[in-house]
């Protein structure tokens, strides 16, 4: 583990993790090559830098990883391959250090803490970024965690490590943005109108909101049933969300919603009516054109071939 000798990474509390598009593309390619159409996950190393509580993940590479499906405590990660790859990457860019590891989860697993403890030997306070390579809803397909020691209230119980969630962002340098724009331009369906795209985006966003609300409800139910410990920080955040909700019992607000809804429904009705009238006019014009073509065909003289008697 001589890899850690040249690394200077702060062990302070991590507040945010920034993931670059190149990392996402590399991880998806790794998954498609190794574990596509299977229940397996792939694991690799994250490279980047850490400063003032922000981890900037700019690169990554795959690492051979195997685990037993029946016994999660049995797993293997190739240390020699990992250290050889890091030395080669360091020759290319000495500013990139090991900042953690990634997994295609798509959620936390029982042996993740053991794998995380392994990376503690390479970098202080590593991050785990779980990438959902097959997302079912709109949003950032990354979830980041770092491990902390949880001290039990009962002094007789030993402390244990637990994962703490940290916010993630997708950011890119100017060169990366140009590449991503070209990729999106190639995969974008030009036959879909802007209105249809906006409606689809709104619908997807509402589905995502519904999923988040259901997740909050499930968490609160588990807390009430005593299956999960009470976390005051989460409850404070939920209370802040509820405090931001508008008071819908105000008459002026109810009237404004009604007027806005009526205006939108009127626009939809007029648009449908105009579209129907235009379609009817197009049908009539086509009928008239067809009749004119038929008359023109009928008015043409018919050439009768002459028959000569032998």
Swiss-Prot record:
This is 26S proteasome non-ATPase regulatory subunit 7 homolog B. The gene is RPN8B. One of its GO terms (biological process) is rRNA processing. One of its GO terms (molecular function) is metallopeptidase activity. Acts as a regulatory subunit of the 26S proteasome which is involved in the ATP-dependent degradation of ubiquitinated proteins. Component of the 19S regulatory particle (RP/PA700) lid subcomplex of the 26S proteasome. The 26S proteasome is composed of a core protease (CP), known as the 20S proteasome, capped at one or both ends by the 19S regulatory particle (RP/PA700). The RP/PA700 complex is composed of at least 17 different subunits in two subcomplexes, the base and the lid, which form the portions proximal and distal to the 20S proteolytic core, respectively. It comes from Arabidopsis thaliana (Mouse-ear cress). One of its GO terms (cellular component) is nucleus. Residues 17-154 form the MPN domain. Belongs to the peptidase M67A family.
